[in-house]
């Protein structure tokens, strides 16, 4: 019987799962849309929804709780400064999951997870800024 099985283990240890979702939540906050497998997306959604709720609270304790779950301070800053303000009037449902076919090679079901009312220019913006900074450093 599968009573009281509250989450998917995804064939990973607790530490690996914790690191996986910290990285994925950070990527979703940074790019506002990521493509991953459907089970990972379904597990990521409640984690990110709780982080947005913390960002809407906006106090120091909430910021520290979010920083404990995320790996980079820049993700915490964007979460509280941009996303918390964007969703201050929305009562939940900050993230949508759309099925995206199957992965070639192992036929794993894929999904796109994204913020509702997302900023379409955010996807890849950090990568472009990093590349421009590296090229400017190489030239000088």
Swiss-Prot record:
Protein name as annotated: Large ribosomal subunit protein bL17
NCBIfam families: L17
Oligomer and partners: Part of the 50S ribosomal subunit. Contacts protein L32.
Underlying gene: rplQ
Taxonomic classification: Bacteria, Pseudomonadati, Pseudomonadota, Alphaproteobacteria, Rhodobacterales
Gene3D superfamilies listed in its UniProt record: Ribosomal protein L17
Record-level GO cellular component terms: cytosolic large ribosomal subunit
InterPro entries in UniProt: Ribosomal_bL17, Ribosomal_bL17_CS, Ribosomal_bL17_sf
Organism annotation: Paracoccus denitrificans (strain Pd 1222)
PROSITE patterns: RIBOSOMAL_L17
Family of the protein in this entry: Belongs to the bacterial ribosomal protein bL17 family.
SUPFAM superfamilies: Prokaryotic ribosomal protein L17 (SSF64263)
Tagged with keyword Repressor: no
GO molecular function: structural constituent of ribosome
């Amino acid at each position: 019987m599968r009573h009281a099985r509250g989450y998917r283990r995804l064939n990973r240890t607790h530490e690996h799962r914790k690191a996986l979702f910290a990285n994925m939540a950070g990527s979703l906050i940074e790019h506002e849309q990521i493509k991953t497998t459907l089970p990972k997306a379904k597990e990521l959604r409640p984690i990110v929804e709780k982080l947005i709720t913390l960002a809407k609270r906006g106090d120091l304790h909430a910021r520290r709780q979010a920083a404990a779950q995320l790996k980079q301070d820049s993700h915490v800053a964007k979460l509280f400064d941009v996303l918390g303000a964007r969703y201050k009037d929305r009562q939940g449902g900050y993230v949508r999951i759309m099925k995206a076919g199957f992965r070639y090679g192992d036929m794993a079901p894929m999904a796109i997870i994204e913020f509702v009312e997302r900023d379409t220019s955010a996807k890849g913006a950090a990568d472009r800024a990093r590349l421009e900074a590296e090229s400017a450093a190489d030239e000088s």
